[in-house]
């Protein structure tokens, strides 16, 4: 697998055309104008050294998007791109148009387009979005959205900031399996319809999000499930651990004609209690000025991890116990006693 590099002013599409499946294309920071990209092979496209801004001054030649991606069976990753201003005559100009395979988006910022992400159907396909921002997308007609996902196998949205769609939905997915976790989904300044719309049902988990429905919403329901007919096979639907704020006088939490969801551990403000919910006594502060949970919105390279600290030195070995004192030298043997003199012999004296 090779790494190809595109410098500011060079053609990104030329690098895509030259890449083999599995290659990575490093795009240097800068503004790339009217570079409309088509990706039909398994590659990774990533920003290096700062933000990569894709801007248009003319309508996309294919009438679709700034980036058109997809073919059945391919895997594409796009990391660190900022795309805005895409418009086409039919009103569906998207930052990125998905047409099949597996698509992974991370650290991207798609804003002020007619569509943020527009996804076609692929029964075996998947889309995963992490640490990204979708803002103020939509053409005002009501049929465009911040995120639209067609009939695919799986859709995952995590740790992202989705807000202020222009009339359409913040997130709409027809995927058979949906996981929407750890996001901020707000409509404080826009006129969106549903915050989350899963029109064909399926298996879905909505957990750990902060969701706000603004006062100018076009639809009172915050979450909708199966409203267009539960054509997807699964019916497991869980909503847990979310903070949900309603600023609309007629707002409602859930439109769900298709199944009985599992509701647990949600905190709500401006809504009646539904299931296992906690009513908040006051409106929570929903400050979005510091989105620290998005590691690098718009493509800034993530900070390097802190250096691994050196392990502390091993303690010195314990001192050995003192040696016992040496044995004293043996005492010299006592002196031999002097020899006993032999007895004196006396002669026999006669008379």
PLM regions and their residue ranges:
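Extracellular beta-strand/beta-solenoid scaffold signature
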Residues: 58-69, 89-97, 112-121, 140-151, ...
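Extracellular, surface-exposed repeat architectures
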Residues: 60-61, 69, 229-230, 275, ...
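Active-site and glycan-interaction determinants of carbohydrate-active enzymes
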Residues: 270-280
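Extracellular beta-strand-rich solenoid/capping regions of secreted or surface-exposed proteins
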Residues: 13, 17-20, 32-46, 53-79, ...
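RTX-like calcium-binding, glycine/aspartate-rich low-complexity repeat tracts
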Residues: 1-3, 292-351
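Right-handed parallel beta-helix
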Residues: 42, 46-52, 73-85, 102-112, ...
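Right-handed parallel beta-helix/beta-solenoid
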Residues: 1-18, 29-31
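Extracellular beta-strand repeat scaffolds in secreted/surface proteins
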Residues: 23-27, 209-211
């Amino acid at each position: 697998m090779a790494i190809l590099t595109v410098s500011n002013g060079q053609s990104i599409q030329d690098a895509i055309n030259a890449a083999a499946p599995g290659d990575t294309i490093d795009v240097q920071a800068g503004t790339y104008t009217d570079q409309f990209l088509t990706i039909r092979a398994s590659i990774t496209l990533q920003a290096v050294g700062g933000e990569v801004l894709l801007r248009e001054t003319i309508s996309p030649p294919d009438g679709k998007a700034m980036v058109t991606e997809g073919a059945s069976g391919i895997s594409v990753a796009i990391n660190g791109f900022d795309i805005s201003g895409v418009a086409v005559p039919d009103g569906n100009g998207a930052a990125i148009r998905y047409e099949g395979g597996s698509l992974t988006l991370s650290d991207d910022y798609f804003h002020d387009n007619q569509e943020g992400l527009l996804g076609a159907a692929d029964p075996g396909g998947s889309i995963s979005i992490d640490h990204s921002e979708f803002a103020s997308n939509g053409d005002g007609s009501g049929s465009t959205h911040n995120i639209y996902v067609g009939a695919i196998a799986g859709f995952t949205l995590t740790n992202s900031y989705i807000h202020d769609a222009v009339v359409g939905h913040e997130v709409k997915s027809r995927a058979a399996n949906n996981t929407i976790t750890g996001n901020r989904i707000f409509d404080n300044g826009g006129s969106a319809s549903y915050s989350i719309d899963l029109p064909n049902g399926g298996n879905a988990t909505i957990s750990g999000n902060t969701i706000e429905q603004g006062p100018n919403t076009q639809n009172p329901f915050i979450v909708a499930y199966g409203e267009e007919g539960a054509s997807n096979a699964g019916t497991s639907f869980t909503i847990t651990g979310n903070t949900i704020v309603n600023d609309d006088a007629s707002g409602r939490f859930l439109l769900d004609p298709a199944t009985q969801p599992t509701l647990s551990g949600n905190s709500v403000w401006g809504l009646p209690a539904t299931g296992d919910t906690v009513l908040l006594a006051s409106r929570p502060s929903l400050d979005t000025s510091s989105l620290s949970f998005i590691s690098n919105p718009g493509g800034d390279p993530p900070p390097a991890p802190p250096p691994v600290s050196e392990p502390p030195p091993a303690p010195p070995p314990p001192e050995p116990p003192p040696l016992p004192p040496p044995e004293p030298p043996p005492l010299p043997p006592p002196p031999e006693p002097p020899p006993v003199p032999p007895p004196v012999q006396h002669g026999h004296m006669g008379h």
